[in-house]
Regions:
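Short, solvent-exposed loop/helix junctions and linker helices
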Residues: 11, 96-99, 188, 192, ...
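Histidine-centered active-site/metal-ligand motif
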Residues: 20, 77, 193, 229, ...
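Short-chain dehydrogenase/reductase
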Residues: 95, 142-150, 184-196, 226-227
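C-terminal substrate-binding subdomain of Rossmann-fold SDR/epimerase-dehydratase oxidoreductases
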Residues: 197-328
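Basic phosphate/pyrophosphate-binding loop/patch that engages nucleotide-derived ligands
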Residues: 110, 158-162, 191-195, 199-202
């Protein structure tokens, strides 16, 4: 990889979402460096056409070395812990990794050639809200994971005012599904992602699914979420980076389809695709909110983006297909 070329660093590039972003960057003939400590990333998700560096964003000296040696001009920053329940019980771990890790990255950018950064944020920073959410809504993080994303956003905005680079903050809604290529998908099982769990259960003789809370202030009592296909989300990062390069204007955008599905609705769709599933209702999880879905007007206007996979049945089917491949 020539040092004179402008290269893109993807932190967390061996993870679920990161690997899909890397896949599309490589498809676009970009020079990509993946930084991942493989704590929540996986070797099998590392794209062989990218340069992989096993490192931790908490290791500031290593980040300096990577950005200098590979002449990084743009960063897509995904490296973070993201288990909502774990965050409530281990705040120090999440503070050090998600907040201090982001701070390290920003401080290293001061004396570098980095021009743009895309940050992986979360719709959870809005807190417990009703209906469609636009980007102007005041942040009100309810759980500690959401708080780490909010604080990281604030660090990026503050740093950008004092330095030359531009930023794109992407507030993800619920990411699901797997790449149409069939080469990558979600491996981690511990995050409690509904569609991932259903895909796992689809391969069992007697599938079971836990629903955390059926007493929320929603139509059927279960949480409502805006599910977005991971390959569509990856495409948003590509278009977001292009926008920063072409327009030199920072942005904050919601990343969803603008349509909410309840947990029960997702389970019912799964039943139609596959088979019956034993539903087991549990207590609410700490940090979970009742309903959240995106207002996508600004999102589509700025990036001129149109989804390719915005079909919930297709999303679930792609997750099941990936799960079958993992098992085999």
């Amino acid at each position: 990889m020539p040092q004179s070329s402008k290269n893109i660093l993807v932190t967390g590039g061996a993870g679920y979402i990161g690997s899909h972003i890397v896949e599309q960057l490589i498809k676009n003939k970009e020079n990509v460096i993946i930084l991942d400590n493989l704590v929540t990333g996986y070797k099998k998700l590392i794209n062989k056409k990218a340069k992989f560096v096993k490192a931790d964003i908490k290791n500031k000296s290593k980040i300096i070395e990577i950005i200098k040696d590979y002449n990084i001009s743009s960063i897509i920053h995904l490296a973070a812990y993201l288990n909502v329940s774990e965050a409530e019980n281990n705040k120090k771990k999440y503070y050090q990794n998600n907040i201090i890790g982001t701070k390290n990255l920003l401080e290293v950018c001061k004396n570098s050639n980095v021009e743009n950064i895309i940050f992986s944020s979360s719709c959870s920073i809005y807190g417990d809200v009703k209906g469609s959410i636009n980007e102007n809504r005041k942040a009100n993080p309810q759980g500690y994971y959401a708080y780490t994303k909010y604080k990281s956003e604030e660090l990026i905005k503050k740093f950008s005012k004092k330095n030359k680079f531009k930023y794109g903050i992407l507030r993800y809604f619920n990411v699901a599904g797997a790449s149409p290529s069939g080469k990558i998908g979600e491996i981690e099982k511990s995050h409690g992602h509904l569609i991932k769990n259903l895909a796992i259960e689809s391969l069992k003789k007697n599938p079971k699914i836990k629903i955390f809370g059926n007493d929320y202030s929603t139509k059927d009592g279960t949480c409502i979420r805006d599910y977005v296909h991971v390959s569509d989300l990856a495409d948003v990062h590509i278009k977001g980076l292009k926008y920063l390069k072409d327009n030199q204007k920072s942005f904050v955008l919601n990343c969803g389809y603008g349509k909410g599905y309840s947990v029960k609705q997702i389970v019912d769709i799964f039943k139609k695709i596959k088979k019956s599933v034993d539903v087991q209702y549990q207590k609410r999880r700490p940090g979970d909110i009742a309903q959240v879905y995106a207002n996508t007007k600004k999102f589509k206007k700025i990036l001129k983006w149109r989804p390719k996979f915005n079909n919930i049945k297709l999303i679930i089917q792609s997750a099941i297909k990936w799960e079958k491949k993992l098992k085999n």
